[in-house]
Regions:
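Cell-envelope/glycan interface and biosynthesis
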Residues: 46-277
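Bacterial Sec-dependent N-terminal signal peptides
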Residues: 1-45, 49-52
Length: 277
């Protein structure tokens, strides 16, 4: 074979192998970071500045109380199964756009974020609350109605980690639960790595942990390392909630009579990390 032709062949083979390698790398990358065209097109239309989207005095009580149908509300979007642990989960578009950016950033550092829960309607929260309140659902094997016959004590126990219907931040479409709802998960190994990353980076994407460890400056719900809130919106909803919602709006569920006794609005709805207000 002529020397020139031989050198040309070597160059061709080298470039072909490089192209194949890059193609495989790009294909793998695309499969890991793929966002559907539908979601991509939707997110392009989202304006992350909320000043003209949310006006403090125009938020309806029904919205604040979770009396909504997210699938029929144009402010919401269905979460792709890739990012969520279940089907038919919805979230407001603004926090979804922010989450997608946070997801990609975390993935580059070997952190995989999964949304376990996002928007929860009044009806859904009522089902959770009354299931625990009546003993219809066993809570870690316990029938709370039998274990706590005193309604005030039962309410305090359930309120450690579950909201009364009409008082959950998940009603607003701004809050997400990530990876696990067990504190032990975040104490070591992969869970600790996830939590440390979120503490360091979630704020860059607009998210804040509302239920930090309780101390003299925070009362209400117990610590929830999995719960993250898109603050630029949730802070506005919280301000509206405290101004517009009264205990007379929280009456359509079992055990509602105890809401005022435990200071639900003052201590639980308002009892969040000051950085999230």
């Amino acid at each position: 074979m002529h020397k020139t032709n031989f050198n040309t062949l070597l160059i061709f083979l080298f470039l072909s192998s490089c192209f194949t390698f890059l193609f495989i790398r790009c294909t793998n990358c695309s499969s890991n970071n793929f966002v559907s065209k539908k979601t991509s097109d939707t997110l392009k239309s989202i304006k992350l500045s909320t000043d003209t989207i949310i006006q403090n005095d125009t938020i309806a009580k029904k919205y604040l109380l979770g009396q909504i149908i997210p699938s029929k509300d144009t402010n919401f979007i269905a979460i792709e199964k890739k990012y969520c642990g279940k089907n038919n989960s919805y979230i407001r578009k603004e926090p979804y756009a922010a989450f997608l950016k946070m997801y990609e950033a975390a993935l580059k550092e070997g952190i995989h974020l999964t949304i376990l829960s996002a928007t929860r309607t009044y009806k859904e929260q009522k089902n959770i609350w009354e299931g625990k309140w009546t003993g219809r659902y066993l809570y870690y094997g316990k029938n709370l109605a039998s274990l706590y016959p005193n309604e005030y004590e039962r309410t305090l126990y359930i309120l450690k980690y579950s909201s009364m219907p009409g008082s959950s931040r998940h009603h607003w479409g701004t809050d997400i639960d990530l990876n696990s709802t067990e504190l032990n998960y975040f104490k070591s190994g992969k869970g600790l790595k996830v939590y440390n990353w979120l503490k360091e980076n979630a704020g860059k994407y607009g998210f804040c942990q509302p239920y930090t460890k309780k101390d003299s400056s925070r009362v209400g719900f117990e610590e929830e390392k999995w719960h993250w809130s898109y603050t630029s919106l949730s802070s506005k909803f919280l301000a509206c909630y405290k101004r517009q919602i009264a205990y007379s709006d929280l009456t359509d569920f079992a055990g509602y009579e105890t809401a005022i006794k435990v200071k639900l609005i003052e201590d639980y709805v308002s009892g969040i990390n000051k950085d999230c207000r």
